[in-house]
């Protein structure tokens, strides 16, 4: 009798969906075509006690969401699944995301959808300005998806939002968190030099060694140059940059990154813990202890940044107004039991 042994053939991964104009691609469909593949996480590491968010007023959260939907606006808080949303919305603050909710990049750490975006909404600058006025904001953060399909990368749209917002709320400070304007830096800088925000922010996201894996389509030196060139054109405007830890970088690489940012004339820094949005996103390499974040802040102050905020829940626009005015970074929320275990509570 002959026994037939079947050869195991691994199941081929599903073919990712094609990008159709106006259709959002998330999860596997978003990251399947990046150079370094993301292996879906089977079991995520347990979050430590310092990954905590302070809850605020549910009524205020609901009020802001209703206002945003009425004006057909997006926030990065919602689209990127920011864990601080309840606290920020509860405190009456939000980061507006302009130029739609579909990004032309596929960064595996980000939860914003990828695809072929729709045309710009010509009414969005006015709607954003009306919302800022309606919420009575004194400090507004405006960010965007990447729009590699636009000749100016969306710089003119930023200008339109700034102009409309300043017209209705002249006392409101405007911070813009811009993409890298890849291939369009000069035209973007020309526009944003002429019509300047109060803070020019661009996130470098991670250390250079990890760029290919986590920022496909972006360039570390290009981001540094964008920050330095803007400061050279508008030395009166504060520049700001943020990045994540917990992706696989070393502590020494973080210090080197801070040195690079200081050498490129950045004024303010934010450093936060990377949190995996879903199993199809890049995995968390480690949860960085609050003591390590404190070392980064100590080093940043030592080398002369105007302000450096670093902590597990810090994000680029986290209490941006407080950082602008020079306040200290809020301490992470810790459990009494954990602090006792680390010997950080007195008798």
Swiss-Prot record:
[4Fe-4S] cluster 1 binds at residues 77, 82, 88, 317. Its EC number is 2.8.1.8. Residues 89-306 form the Radical SAM core domain. Keywords: 4Fe-4S, Cytoplasm, Iron, Iron-sulfur, Metal-binding, S-adenosyl-L-methionine, Transferase. It catalyses: [[Fe-S] cluster scaffold protein carrying a second [4Fe-4S](2+) cluster] + N(6)-octanoyl-L-lysyl-[protein] + 2 oxidized [2Fe-2S]-[ferredoxin] + 2 S-adenosyl-L-methionine + 4 H(+) = [[Fe-S] cluster scaffold protein] + N(6)-[(R)-dihydrolipoyl]-L-lysyl-[protein] + 4 Fe(3+) + 2 hydrogen sulfide + 2 5'-deoxyadenosine + 2 L-methionine + 2 reduced [2Fe-2S]-[ferredoxin]. GO terms for cellular component: cytoplasm. Its main location: cytoplasm. SMART domains: Elp3. Pathway: Protein modification; protein lipoylation via endogenous pathway; protein N(6)-(lipoyl)lysine from octanoyl-[acyl-carrier-protein]: step 2/2. Its cofactor is [4Fe-4S] cluster. Belongs to the radical SAM superfamily. Lipoyl synthase family. This is Lipoyl synthase. It comes from Psychrobacter sp. (strain PRwf-1). The lineage of its organism: Bacteria, Pseudomonadati, Pseudomonadota, Gammaproteobacteria, Moraxellales. The gene is lipA.
């Amino acid at each position: 009798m002959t026994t037939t042994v079947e050869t195991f053939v691994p199941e081929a991964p599903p073919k990712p969906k094609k990008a159709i104009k106006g259709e959002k691609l998330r999860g596997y469909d978003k990251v399947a075509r990046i150079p370094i593949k993301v292996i879906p996480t089977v079991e995520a590491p347990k979050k430590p006690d310092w990954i905590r968010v302070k809850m605020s007023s549910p009524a205020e959260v609901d009020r802001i969401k209703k206002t945003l939907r009425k004006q057909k606006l997006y926030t990065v808080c919602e689209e990127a699944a920011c864990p601080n949303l309840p606290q920020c919305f509860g405190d009456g603050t939000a980061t507006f995301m302009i130029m739609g909710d579909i990004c032309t990049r596929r960064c595996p750490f980000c939860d914003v959808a990828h695809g072929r975006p729709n045309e710009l909404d010509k009414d969005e600058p006015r709607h954003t300005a009306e919302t800022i006025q309606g919420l009575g904001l004194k400090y507004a953060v405006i960010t965007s998806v990447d729009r590699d399909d636009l000749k100016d990368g969306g710089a003119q749209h930023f200008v339109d939002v700034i102009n409309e917002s300043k017209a209705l709320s002249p006392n409101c400070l405007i911070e813009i968190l811009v993409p890298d304007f890849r291939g369009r830096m000069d035209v973007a800088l020309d526009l944003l030099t002429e019509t300047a925000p109060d803070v020019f922010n661009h996130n470098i996201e991670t250390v250079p060694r990890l760029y290919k894996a986590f920022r496909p389509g972006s360039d570390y030196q290009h981001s540094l140059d964008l920050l330095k060139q803007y400061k050279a054109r508008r030395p009166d405007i504060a520049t700001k940059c943020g990045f994540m830890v917990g992706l696989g970088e070393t502590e020494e690489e973080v210090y080197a990154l801070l040195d690079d940012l200081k050498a490129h004339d950045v004024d303010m820094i934010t450093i936060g813990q990377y949190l995996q949005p879903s199993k199809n996103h890049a995995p968390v390499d480690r949860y960085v202890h609050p003591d390590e974040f404190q070392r980064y802040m100590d080093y940043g102050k030592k080398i002369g940044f105007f302000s450096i905020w670093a902590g597990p829940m810090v994000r680029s626009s986290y209490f941006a107004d407080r950082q602008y005015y020079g306040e200290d970074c809020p301490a992470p929320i810790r459990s009494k039991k954990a602090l006792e275990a680390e010997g950080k509570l007195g008798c």
